[in-house]
A protein has these predicted regions:
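Rossmann-fold NAD(P) dinucleotide-binding segment
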Residues: 44, 286, 410-430
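Active-site beta->alpha loop and helix N-cap motifs at the rims of alpha/beta catalytic domains
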Residues: 1-122, 135, 142
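Catalytic alpha/beta core domains of metabolic enzymes, predominantly
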Residues: 92-224
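Phosphate/diphosphate ligand-binding glycine-rich loop within oxidoreductases
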Residues: 222-332, 437, 443-445, 449
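Short acidic low-complexity segments
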Residues: 386-400
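Adenosine-phosphate binding glycine-rich loop
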Residues: 332-336, 427-429, 433-476
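Glycine-rich adenosine-cofactor-binding loop
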Residues: 169, 224-231, 316-321, 328, ...
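Glycine/small-residue-rich loop that forms an oxyanion/phosphate-binding "nest" at active or ligand-binding sites
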Residues: 52-96, 286-335
Length: 476
């Protein structure tokens, strides 16, 4: 189930908020702490035909309650007499509100600013206290900026327990916990009704969970592939993969996450039965460190942007260079299987992304040269890759067929370390592999000057298709 929180300040508007939430949610959390005046709780509970979870939170637990603690307890006792399906009680006061009627009890442990205990024993103690407080469900709210912060509870919910667990992780990996919680049997996950109504920054909306993450299709058997990042480009790719996997009848989904360092990542992935990790396009050094071996095309130290668990070994793959060059070669056209053969290709950049493209263009038989904002670094890359180096002072006298822009920090201009826009001229074909899905200033400039352009959307689609093919063995 999806639980949507409503936080009305007016009794008059409370029913409208409940009605709006009932159209998309399976369970509605009615937060009484935001109301200015005492409500008729029974009237509100009967306002919609969806289950209601009543809560009234103190400021220390993220709520807006300004009255006394005794007044809050009295309001919770009144609420339980109205017999909503659920009531949320803080762990430290749950024993002061006795069970009543058919209302089930969510006993909540909240730590807004401190992570959960590092040991399982500390988590077990909370469960024991919740059980003594007559809990039907245990709820945890805590900071989850990374997988490591979410780990104490994730390691617990991935195993069978007597009490069901729900969680509201504050931070990016709260989404990670929610999707894994669905797999491991959490009764519900929390979502905002729409943008601007999030309980915390980054909380997914109902639309996000349905359209991007397809959460209703996640089952115990679902295989997760982790994705490094929560930015818009990563989440768009998550949505594309999940839609294609769903259409193909594949029980696999992408799982956005973030981690602090590599020291425990493989152990955590193994426990959570996560089958792979999609890194940053163009190679992720952290994934390269974890790869026990690489696909043959990458050689011993080629850039890794996909890590897959193959027969117990973590194997590294490179997808961006292949996908970007497929898009480039499609734009070049012709009947040759290697359209780059004997064409002069200039790669501009000196970092990992540039190294990836030099690697790929060389394999596709292009006549590759390297230039960059720093001549020394460009010369080192050229020497390491056994290709030609073009000093900045000679760049504008260099005739090339294809220009691959592979510098995320590329600046257009006449200054030192900048790319003068006048260099971009027809009949050059321009590919910017740092563009993502959007036009960059360099792409816009190249297009305005009459150059051919490999459209960013085309490259993005090709990368998504390459990842889908590498992970599933099927075409998208």
């Amino acid at each position: 189930m999806i639980c949507i929180s409503v936080t009305p300040e007016s009794r008059r508007l409370a029913k409208a908020d409940l009605l709006n939430a009932s159209r998309q949610g399976d369970l509605i959390e009615l937060c009484l702490d935001h109301l200015v005046k005492s409500p008729d709780i029974a009237d509100l509970v009967e306002a919609v035909d969806k289950p209601i979870l009543v809560a009234c939170r103190r400021s220390q637990d993220g709520g807006q309650w300004t009255g006394s603690e005794e007044e809050r307890l009295q309001l919770l006792r009144q609420a339980i007499v109205a017999e909503p399906e659920w009531i949320e009680l803080d762990l430290d006061i749950a024993s002061q509100v006795p069970r009543y009627g058919k209302t089930q009890r969510v006993v909540a442990y909240t730590s807004l600013y401190q992570p959960l205990g590092a040991s399982r024993a500390e988590i077990d103690q909370i469960f024991e206290k919740a059980q003594k407080a007559d809990a039907d469900v245990v709820k945890f709210t805590w900071p989850t900026p990374t997988l490591e912060a979410a780990w104490p509870l994730l390691s617990v919910v991935s195993q069978s327990r007597d009490l069901p667990v729900v969680g509201m992780g504050l931070g990016d990996c709260g989404l990670t916990f929610s999707l894994l919680g669905r797999k491991y049997g959490s009764p519900w996950i929390y979502a905002a009704l729409e943008r601007g109504m999030e309980a915390y920054e980054g909380q997914p909306t109902v639309g996000d969970l349905d359209e991007v993450h397809r959460w209703r299709e996640i089952r115990t058997s679902t295989k997760f592939i982790a994705v490094d990042g929560f930015d818009d480009a990563s989440l768009a790719m998550v949505g594309a993969f999940n839609a294609a996997a769903g259409d193909a009848g594949l029980d696999a989904r992408w799982l956005p996450l973030a981690w602090a360092d590599n020291s425990r990542l493989v152990q955590m992935l193994d426990v959570l039965k996560i089958q792979g990790v999609v890194g940053r396009p163009g190679g992720d050094e952290r994934l390269g460190e974890l790869a026990q071996r690489r696909e043959a095309a990458l050689g011993p130290d080629g850039p890794v942007d996909l890590l897959m668990n193959k027969d117990g070994n973590w194997q590294g793959f490179g997808c961006l260079w292949r996908a970007a060059l497929l898009a480039l070669e499609a734009e070049l056209g012709g009947e040759s299987e290697t359209p780059l053969d004997r064409r002069s290709v200039l790669v501009i950049g000196t970092g990992p992304l540039a190294r990836t493209m030099v690697f790929g263009a060389t394999r596709r038989k292009g006549l590759v040269s390297v230039a960059g904002s720093d001549d020394g670094m460009a010369q080192q890359l050229a020497a390491a890759s056994d290709v030609r180096f073009v000093p900045a002072q000679n760049l504008y006298d260099t005739l090339v067929d294809v220009v691959i822009l592979a510098d995320p920090d590329l600046v257009l201009g006449p200054g030192r370390g900048e790319l003068n826009p006048s260099f971009l001229r027809p009949p050059m074909l321009i590919l910017d592999v740092a563009a993502g899905r959007e036009d960059t200033p360099a792409i816009e400039e190249a297009r305005s000057r009459g150059c051919g352009v490999v459209e960013p959307e085309t490259v993005w689609t090709s990368v998504t298709e390459s990842l889908f093919r590498s992970i599933t063995g099927q075409s998208m």
